[in-house]
Curated annotation (Swiss-Prot):
Signal peptide: none annotated. GO terms for molecular function: electron transfer activity; heme binding; metal ion binding. Its cofactor is heme b. It is found in: Cell membrane. The chain crosses the membrane at residues 12-32, 46-66, 87-107, 121-141. Heme b 2 binds at H53, H121. It comes from the Bacteria. It comes from Cereibacter sphaeroides (strain ATCC 17023 / DSM 158 / JCM 6121 / CCUG 31486 / LMG 2827 / NBRC 12203 / NCIMB 8253 / ATH 2.4.1.). This is Cytochrome b562.
């Protein structure tokens, strides 16, 4: 993986697309819960919200795989060496892991009919939201308190 000064337009687009899709699915996640309850009662789920949730979840999975591949092909900015930089790198790694794990658990629960995966799916989705909040607050702290322009790396392509 090469060290680059910033991110490419593709990497930035993938970052924000994945973030938006994750947020969308989190906000409208109750449609899946209602659909799951209906199926357990042998009733056809109402509406199309659950289908949309599945499609968006699959998109998150595919886009995350593309984003990980892009990291290796296109490179990423050099990582810092401070303890805070190491925490940030760990947080980023967890976000990547969760954006793969949540759709996989969702597919296992819904598509695979494995009810045990529904609880971990929801728990991991909640973890994504918590870590994304920490990630966003940290980026804003860098931009507006430290004034190191770190946030611009994910807004302006190299």
């Amino acid at each position: 993986m090469t060290q680059e000064p910033g991110y490419t337009r593709l990497q930035i687009t993938l970052h924000w697309a994945i973030a938006g899709l994750v947020l969308f699915n989190y906000i409208f996640g109750e449609t899946m819960e209602r659909a799951y309850d209906a199926v357990r009662q042998n009733v056809e789920p109402a509406g199309v919200g659950h289908y949309l949730h599945v499609v968006v979840g699959l998109a998150v999975l595919v886009l995350t795989l593309v984003r990980i591949g892009a990291r290796f092909v296109l490179g990423v900015p050099e990582k810092g060496t401070t303890p805070g930089d190491k925490v940030a790198a760990g947080l980023q790694g967890l976000l990547y892991l969760l954006t793969l794990l949540v759709p996989a658990l969702g597919m296992t629960a819904w598509g695979g009919g494995q009810a045990w995966a529904a609880g971990p799916h929801v728990l991991a989705a909640n973890a994504i939201m918590l870590l994304a909040l920490v990630h966003a607050v940290s980026a804003l702290f860098h931009q507006y308190v430290l004034k190191d322009r770190l946030l611009l790396r994910m807004m302006r392509p190299r």
